[in-house]
């Protein structure tokens, strides 16, 4: 996890200095934050695997959901957006961990 934290701190410092684009970072902080979440998911999943407790850690995107955040412009209803998170919480995902999911499928990232 220290590697992911360092990357996020590097991005934060680049933004504070106003030179994130020159350093090769994307212009959207939202995208960088999501990449950080995916990286952290992988790191925590590996830690949990080593503990042998059977805890599965994954991350997911609900999709573009009709919410206040999207000002009602989403293509999915909140119930549709909740399908993948609920599946990850209570469904049989075959012991998969450290992955990124969308539309109830693993997305390579």
Regions found by a protein language model. Give the residues of each.
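C-terminal helical subdomain
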Residues: 59-62, 67, 71-109
